[in-house]
């Protein structure tokens, strides 16, 4: 997504491939010390692959949110829903075989955002096939990672929030 928004010179991508909620939490100090204007958080799918429950993932996201609010109270926080996955490819089975957990996380994430005064960005409904509850194959070729078309859709969804003053 960072590469799809090249005109934003002050945007920093702090995502790490394979990261989990507590990995984000443990790396927050230098980020919040910089008092960023905005933080866009999308985390949880790798926790799913480790067998972590939706409730535990939400608890850990809540810890992240509280730390950001405490250490950088003026930072506007955007919680992005976890993207759907699709198990039809036979790849990334730790993630894709637990596709129902993603919906459970998102059902809990939106109320968390409201409770904590964060904005909630619903990515899930744009990427999911309504009939199956799984990621639309138009956006992936492995059931987990986005193709270019998926990144462009994500960019189009997030851009208004990036542009917001």
Task: Identify the residue ranges that each predicted region occupies.
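Alpha-helical scaffolding within the catalytic cores
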Residues: 21-32, 59-67
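Catalytic His-Asp segment of secreted/periplasmic serine-dependent ester chemistry enzymes
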Residues: 85-165
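Charged helix-capping and loop-helix junction motifs
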Residues: 54-64, 99-105
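A short beta-strand-loop structural module common to alpha/beta enzyme folds
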Residues: 10-21
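Short, small-residue-biased leader/transition segments that mark boundaries at the very start
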Residues: 2-5
């Amino acid at each position: 997504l960072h590469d799809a928004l090249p005109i934003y010179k002050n945007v920093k991508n702090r995502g790490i491939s394979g990261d989990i909620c507590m990995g984000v939490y443990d790396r927050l100090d230098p980020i919040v010390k910089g008092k960023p204007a905005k933080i866009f958080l999308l985390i949880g799918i790798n926790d799913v692959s480790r067998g972590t429950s939706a409730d535990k993932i939400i608890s850990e996201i809540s810890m992240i949110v509280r730390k950001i609010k405490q250490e950088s109270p003026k930072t506007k926080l955007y919680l992005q829903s976890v993207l759907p996955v699709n198990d039809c490819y036979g790849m990334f089975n730790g993630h894709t075989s637990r596709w129902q957990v993603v919906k459970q996380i998102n059902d809990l994430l939106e109320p968390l955002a409201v409770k904590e005064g964060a904005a909630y960005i619903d990515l899930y409904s744009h990427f999911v096939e309504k009939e199956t509850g799984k990621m639309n194959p138009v956006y992936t070729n492995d059931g987990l990672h986005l193709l270019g078309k998926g990144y462009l859709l994500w960019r189009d969804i997030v851009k208004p929030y990036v542009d917001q003053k």
